[in-house]
Amino acid sequence: MSTLMIGAATSEMALDAASLATGRMLEAPLRAGAFVIVHDQTPFCMISCDVIALTRDLVDEIGAGVAGTCGIPADNLLVTSTHTHHAPGTLPIYLNPRNEAFAQRTVAAAVDAARKAM
């Protein structure tokens, strides 16, 4: 008999007063959400982050973190962004550099959401 387990969770991305949104004001809490499905001991994870975009290096960091924390291989992971303009920049846009501190908080929140969804 096959087994199916499903879990979902979110983790907030902490903001500080110095964080500027990419194009607009900050309006609501920003989160990473994870949805985990384990079918016959094979795990799959989908993560969505409230950011404008995710660069390859951030996706790779999320993948490594999820693999190390949850045991879910990167090949079984889908990571996406909501493309909100109400979050600090996770990539350089025009003359604005990437907000490195927020980018790392995004990675941490994504991994934490996956951990909680397990």
Predicted features by range, described:
Residues 1-118:
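Conserved beta-alpha junction segments in alpha/beta enzyme cores
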